[in-house]
């Protein structure tokens, strides 16, 4: 059934209804005032592209795409969206959407205005802030228009910015689907956004931004909103900052129109103290329901507050970074501009002023991007920029959200940045204080408080997962991880100009080895002398097929169960030997902190043969660590036999272990809801693996996504795991979880004495 009502869904339905849909359902169940609506679920989009035969055409266009080529990215995006919008919707799907809209209208006895919003299955999730990549259509009325906008939302899964973000975040296009939320519109007199805790520091301070009319003016950065800061500890309004709201967006004749506001209205306070307190109360209820700080969208109509969206805040820093830079007081230069410090950090560089996405090619690596307000299409330039400064916007505008996610300093709402700052000027941007200084300013290091910033020491090592060698130095510095528990080299291999075997067939094996060595060295050097476990290539055939020379890759019904991991390594022995030679070059240079990790092991014979090849290539296994991943029930159940072949460590790959144990394809939205790393069967295999490792003196670790989940990590520590490897943004949080779990275990033992 393609349509699900919001009242019938909850957080467990994310694979079906996406982040937005699931969150709205959760709010309704918590009795939060949310406008009624329904979701066209993600299975329907899949059914649409499969039934109409357009799926292969879409994904083939994406496989060959270089997302850094802006012009080609735009062209491919346009072509895909045109294919979707011009393809006729299957009759049964269209009929159900029309019937659901009619039912929504029955309560009021007339056609109602609705908002039609995309709800991507990777959007609004706790570990990825996708900053509004997909589209929202407001003031939609009538069955025909609803059907049309649903198709446009499907197409918005392939906007340039959405495609670009997925590649940057490591999401495969085929793995991300899209649901569409159709929800009654609130004809808001006032609206805005509320962070239930500070979006950067995490302090118990509620930040509310408000405008007259529709809230789209805030997120788009079209106006500078009022900002209210409410101290949740002292229970009082701490700060009121009135923004200059030159116009408002409102509904007129079924369209969103821009209405100029007279100066007295533009500078009028939007919210009363009473309204602020009511919003804070609702925000606290929502935060308590989810158990974590929330980014909440709200609207007021006829004096009643409605919550139209809530998502987790993904940008809170767990602690101030060690040696975080600040502008030296002695060296503070002339202040050119002041605004809101929207994303912390200090950066100096040359100014590049742009006024539209057509000019983003002007912005080079290390420039200071200055604009009226960023748009999602400017993200490639934002990624290159050292810092971002805007005329307009508040703490929840596009520039602020994306800058925090990218880790780029930003100052927003300066009002006159594009007039004061000129191309070529050298400035320093302080994203903490919200100040832009003239010239390149000397920086000072923040003294490290002896107690407040004391490092957390744990017996269980906390390592980090790395996919992109270019970020290794920064990740090593910022996380202070105990090493790399998973270095996925297939990501860098898939980024080469041709298939690994084509290098070999073309007689360029030495060049291929050198390319591997150079990229591996970036990671091994950044973390030296801490261990770096390099996983040999584990990409499925469908990813290799898109490369030049990959035409001979087998076409498999389910590549995740096919020719990958150790199977490919041993079948394409020349390629595996090349990997071993690249690692040997590192060892010969003195980088004995490397470890070799074999993926998808199912038998001792695979380990034995891999070791024979490594030794024959001169790899000194007495100097480095050699281990395996436990990703299959087979490996977990015969681990004793695998250990006999001589290994130093075992790492649990819980992503695959979970789906192989439960017979669930985690990328299939029809069954993804069954995917559960804490299923008793999965936990028994994990516990068994750790126990067997302890009995045989072999190190145990985890590098799957579950290693970034606090509730799973607590169990791993209880089981006695030696190390946990988490995603970079989760390392500090996991370190805290590990420390708490270890303390609890010690206390429990003491109580028994």
Swiss-Prot record:
Recorded catalytic activity of this chain's protein: pyruvate + ATP + H2O = phosphoenolpyruvate + AMP + phosphate + 2 H(+)
Q: Which residues bind Mg(2+)?
A: 631, 656
Superkingdom classification of source: Archaea
List UniProt keywords, sorted A-Z: ATP-binding, Kinase, Magnesium, Metal-binding, Nucleotide-binding, Transferase
Enumerate the Gene Ontology biological process terms.
gluconeogenesis
Write down the top EC class of this protein: transferase
Q: Which GO terms describe its molecular function?
A: ATP binding; metal ion binding; pyruvate, water dikinase activity
Residues involved in substrate binding: 488, 535, 631, 653-656
User: Further remark, if any?
Assistant: The reaction takes place in three steps, mediated by a phosphocarrier histidine residue located on the surface of the central domain. The two first partial reactions are catalyzed at an active site located on the N-terminal domain, and the third partial reaction is catalyzed at an active site located on the C-terminal domain. For catalytic turnover, the central domain swivels from the concave surface of the N-terminal domain to that of the C-terminal domain.
The record's comment about this protein's domains reads: The N-terminal domain contains the ATP/Pi binding site, the central domain the pyrophosphate/phosphate carrier histidine, and the C-terminal domain the pyruvate binding site.
Mind telling me what this protein is named? Probable phosphoenolpyruvate synthase
